[in-house]
Amino acid sequence: MTASPKNEMWTVFKRLMGYLKPMKGMFLLSVVGLIVYGLVDAAFISFIGPFIDKGFSSSAPAISNGIALPTSQGFHADNQVLLMAPIVVILMFSLRGFANFVSTYGISYMSARLIMDMRQQVFEHYLSLPVSYMDKENTGNLISKVTFDTEQIARASGSALISIVRDSVTIIGMLGLMFYNSWKLSLCILVIGPIMGVVITIVSRRFRKVSKQIQTAMGDVSAATEQMIKGHKNVLAFGGQETETARFAKINDRNRHQNMKLAVAQAVSQPLIMVIGSFALAFVLYAASLDSMKADLTAGTFATILGAMMAMLQPIKNLTRVNAEFQRGIAACTTVFELLDTVPESDTGTYTVARAKGNLRFDNVSFSYEGQERRALEKIDFEVSQGQTLALVGRSGSGKSTIASLVTRFYTGLESGDILLDDVSIYDYSLKSLRSQVALVSQQVTLFNDTIANNIAYAYPGEVTREQIIEAATLAHAMEFIEQLPDGLDTQVGENGVLLSGGQRQRIAIARAMLRDAPVLILDEATSALDTESEKAIQQGLDNLRQNRTSVVIAHRLSTIESADQILVVDQGRIVERGTHKSLLELGGMYAKLYQMQFGS
């Protein structure tokens, strides 16, 4: 049974309030400031009645030196009340200003802290999610949750706290003031209350629905922008400016349309609340004109009630306006909490080892990706011992990279079989321990917007010296181009290494793997971006790296794996051939055909 929208909203709100627990002192201080602010407003209105009734009275003429002074209005002034009035006003508004400062500072502090904490939690949760989740999610939506959604939540939280506390206290104070002065007249306004409640409930549902659509639309805008920026060169090369412009215009207009839906709902709700409030005010004015009411009213009392009613209109309007903001925040909260509730990567293994020997075995492994009926791997069975090199070759999409991804548990859920490292199932290892045994160089190199040295030393377990970085870069034949750069190892590579060539990026990635010095090495098309000269130069370094390490090499260029101890030919998820380079050529099967296609007869 699904929760009602109202119950769901309060569940989300209570969960959001949990983020304020570490700041409960600041929260209480802000609430006190807001309460004082609202009470001062009510106190100021309550001052109107005595000021009129006692400050100005028609009960007796004004007296000066024992002589009655006629006035055109028939009132005389109580000088003591009139003299006290300015002092009271100054004190009230000074207190109100101080309370406003305290509450504003406190809410700003909590909002900034809330944004920081939620962003940190979302970012850390991204790092704990499986690769399969990232494969199917829209990158723009993921980024939007960190940037846009968290801002919406903080803004809504601050606005909601201000209105819910300050404006509610003001309204309650004004109602109390009205009932204290004339409960009969004040009952008139309660007739309108339920009608306002129904209107606000209906509008709230509309706000929440449209706000969720806005979150999605903003994610689409982020995704389209990111896609264009990443593919900027291709867009220019293929003359796709008009295509991208039209695509973004469509997405952008959809976002505008969703925002206009919210604006219309907000524009309709506020005047509607005001019109309903005007009926209440008109009803009070009518009731005050009745003879039965006049007997109990003084000029000051009526002015107080009227002033209280007028003073309530703006807080009611604020509550209606903040309702739209609040619903946007709840919608953003819902999407963020759905993300945070996503099950992180499974890490139930407890086995740890400082350094594995590197004996790797696939035991009759079958695997299919989530949502795919066809198996990506079918009964894969092989063993590679410490210090040996296993090469995987085959057509694109045959399953080579899937085998490599399973070793690091990027994907889980084998349909049959097991994968063992040193005769221990990789699923018995803790993720941290397992992945510390593996160094990976893929065909899609990821470099961070930092120096070359820091990219080579990325995530190195422990302190790393400059000499170690230089040694790794030298073995990867990266120092050849690094020494020619103005800042050498301290050269900034730009976002994802955009300031370097493809071959240079690949060699930095290889140097990173060399520095890691893991017992298992996975090279997924590691030399694909290198020219022939660079490829030959780096082979000696790779041969040195492979010594006493288990190496799994996925290669398109067959010249790079001729020295492999074992070569597996993979086709449609199955191993169709296995052997050494020489034996497979003699076999005259698929490997021989692939070799012939690259090098001729």
From Swiss-Prot:
Family stated for the protein in its record: Belongs to the ABC transporter superfamily. Lipid exporter (TC 3.A.1.106) family.
EC annotation from Swiss-Prot or TrEMBL: 7.5.2.6
Predominant cellular place of this UniProt entry's protein: membrane
Source species of the chain: Shewanella oneidensis (strain ATCC 700550 / JCM 31522 / CIP 106686 / LMG 19005 / NCIMB 14063 / MR-1)
GO cellular component: plasma membrane
Keyword terms, alphabetized: ATP-binding, Cell inner membrane, Cell membrane, Lipid transport, Membrane, Nucleotide-binding, Translocase, Transmembrane, Transmembrane helix, Transport
Signal peptide (UniProt feature, chain positions): none
Membrane topology, from the record: Multi-pass membrane protein
Function, as annotated: Involved in lipopolysaccharide (LPS) biosynthesis. Translocates lipid A-core from the inner to the outer leaflet of the inner membrane. Transmembrane domains (TMD) form a pore in the inner membrane and the ATP-binding domain (NBD) is responsible for energy generation.
ABC transporter domain location: 360-597
Domain-level remarks: In MsbA the ATP-binding domain (NBD) and the transmembrane domain (TMD) are fused.
Pfam families referenced in this protein's UniProt entry, alphabetically: ABC_membrane, ABC_tran
Catalysed reaction, written as an equation: ATP + H2O + lipid A-core oligosaccharideSide 1 = ADP + phosphate + lipid A-core oligosaccharideSide 2
Spans traversing the lipid bilayer: 32-52, 81-101, 160-180, 183-203, 267-287, 296-316
BP-aspect Gene Ontology terms: transmembrane transport
Compartment(s) of residence: Cell inner membrane
Positions that bind ATP: 394-401
PANTHER family: ATP-BINDING CASSETTE SUB-FAMILY B MEMBER 10, MITOCHONDRIAL, ATP-DEPENDENT PERMEASE MDL1, MITOCHONDRIAL
Assembly notes: Homodimer.
GO molecular-function terms, A-Z: ABC-type transporter activity; ATP binding; ATP hydrolysis activity; ATPase-coupled lipid transmembrane transporter activity
Record keyword Cell inner membrane present: yes
Protein name (database record): ATP-dependent lipid A-core flippase
Domain (ABC transmembrane type-1): residue spans on this chain: 28-328
